[in-house]
Every structure is written in C-alpha cells, then in structure tokens.
Design a protein with these regions (language model features):
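Short acidic-glycine-tyrosine-enriched beta hairpin
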Residues: 2-3, 8-10, 69-87
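Structural motif
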Residues: 16, 55, 62-64, 71, ...
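A short glycine-rich, His/Asp/Glu-containing loop-to-beta-strand
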Residues: 10-46, 52-53
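Ligand-binding loop in jelly-roll beta-barrel domains
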Residues: 84-111
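Short beta-strand segments
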Residues: 44-46, 67-72
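Residue-level recognition of conserved beta-strand positions in structured domain cores
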Residues: 34, 67-69, 76, 84, ...
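Acidic/histidine-enriched, glycine/proline-rich intrinsically disordered or flexible terminal extensions
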Residues: 113-144
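Short, conserved beta-strand element in jelly-roll/cupin
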Residues: 34-38, 48-66, 103
C-alpha cells in the first residue's frame, strides 16, 4: 500500500496536470491525475487512447467532453468513462475554472507524456504539431 505525496504541477499551455498516483504506485493497475482547465483555455486536439481507458470525475466547474461525436457536459460529482479507442476531446466553455480527476486503466500513461508535450507547447510560437503527434504515438495516443 502506498500513500502518494504531492507531486509537481505540469503546465501544458494554460492547463495544469498533477499526478496523484502513477502506474508504479499501483503495480500498473491505474494512474490518477488532477487536471485544471481555465475558461477558454487551449485544449488538446481530438485524440484516442490505443492502450488504455480513461475515467473522468468532475470536481469543480462544468466541462464539456466530445466523445465519438457526442457532446456530454459534466458537472461536479458526475463521471464519464471513455473506452479505449474512442475519439474524444474536452473544452471549458464556462466562466469558472474546471477541475477533474482522470483515471487511466491500466496505469501506462506517465507524467513523462505531459512533460514532453509541455516542452513543445510551452516553447513559444505555434506548437510543432508533428512533434506533438510523435510524442502522442510513443505514449499510446493517436490524434484524430
């Protein structure tokens, strides 16, 4: 049994990611991170996960998820399961900052993914989308 200690906040543009549990903490069963999204922030392009599922639990604000062309709006306390292979994206159209927990099962997505994307996105100027796509591919994501 492990108690996770507070970890770094990884900033990808305006979005903040903070891992609470990594796959190494759970024998690979899951990874868990908190995501903070200000209103009208640039968000990830539509994508799908090749090797894992994602479950979202809304903590604060209202976040809209587009999953396989269907628009779903989550309020605090609501959850959403995104199956492996489902094309999805999220956006904060509201006036308050959104916070949600994302659980990755199995726990194969590490903070390294977000660190690598942050290095490209936060470099200044338009992000190198080809480079972001390469990073995504190495970590089990496909742009849609």
């Amino acid at each position: 049994m492990n108690i996770a200690m507070p970890r770094e906040v990884i900033r990808v543009g305006q979005i903040e990611i903070r891992y609470l549990l990594e796959g190494a903490d759970t024998n690979g069963a899951l990874a868990l991170f908190e995501c903070t999204v200000p209103p009208n922030a640039r968000v990830p392009a539509p994508h799908r996960h090749v090797t894992y599922e994602e479950t979202i639990w809304e903590i604060a604000g209202t976040c809209t998820f587009l999953v396989e062309g269907r628009e779903l709006t989550l309020a605090p306390g609501q959850a959403l399961f995104i199956p492996r292979g489902a094309a999805h994206q999220f956006v904060n159209r509201g006036s308050e900052t959104v916070r949600f927990l994302a659980t990755i099962t199995p726990g194969v997505l590490s903070p390294d993914f977000f660190r690598e994307v942050a290095a490209v996105v936060n470099a200044g100027g338009p992000p190198d989308l080809k480079r972001v796509g390469e990073i995504m591919g190495r970590h089990g994501l496909q742009p849609v």
